[in-house]
Design a protein with these regions (language model features):
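P-loop (Walker A) phosphate-binding loop of NTP-binding proteins
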Residues: 35-37
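Short hydrophobic/aromatic beta-strand immediately N-terminal to the Walker A/P-loop
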Residues: 31-33
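Short beta-strand-centered segment that lines the nucleotide-binding/catalytic pocket of NTP-utilizing
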Residues: 55-70
Length: 142
């Protein structure tokens, strides 16, 4: 299945509702990549999705490239803003964490390899006009 949706959000409440709808279609294991300008809401979306998977205390990963949270569904939260990504990075840093049921939430990620064996979701956030309105383009490949 491959589907693309476009969602306009005008408030934090709209963002939370978007996350609630997204959570309903995520099938673990899953890779969710997020891209958008600084301050566009990537971390907010990650935190809201993480809460729905039972992880209530995740931090912004800006100073740590990969954070692992153990639970019923393990969460790997990545922030690649300052990272020098190459295939070895994924093999060495990410692959060892992929045990049990898991979800990867990867911010600033335009180069995370797609995995044909799991659900791949790409989220692109576009700041519309400086008023706080954003457009979220979501592509789901299952």
């Amino acid at each position: 299945m491959n589907s693309t949706t476009t969602t306009d959000v005008n408030s934090i409440g709209d963002t939370y509702r978007y996350c609630e709808q997204l959570f309903k279609v995520i099938k673990v294991p899953a890779i969710v990549t997020l891209s958008g300008d600084l301050g566009s809401g990537k971390t907010t979306i990650c935190k809201e999705i993480a809460k729905r998977f039972g992880h209530h205390q995740i931090n912004s990963s800006s100073y740590q490239t990969v954070s692992f949270y153990s639970g019923v569904t393990n969460l790997i939260h990545c922030d690649f803003f300052r990272a020098d990504l190459n295939e070895r990075f994924f093999d060495d840093e990410i692959d060892p964490l992929l045990v049990g049921d898991w979800i990867i939430l990867a911010e600033w990620c335009d180069s995370m390899p797609m995995n044909p064996n799991v659900q791949n979701i790409t989220i692109r956030i576009i700041n519309s006009d400086g008023s706080g309105k954003r457009t979220i383009i979501t592509n789901i490949i299952s």
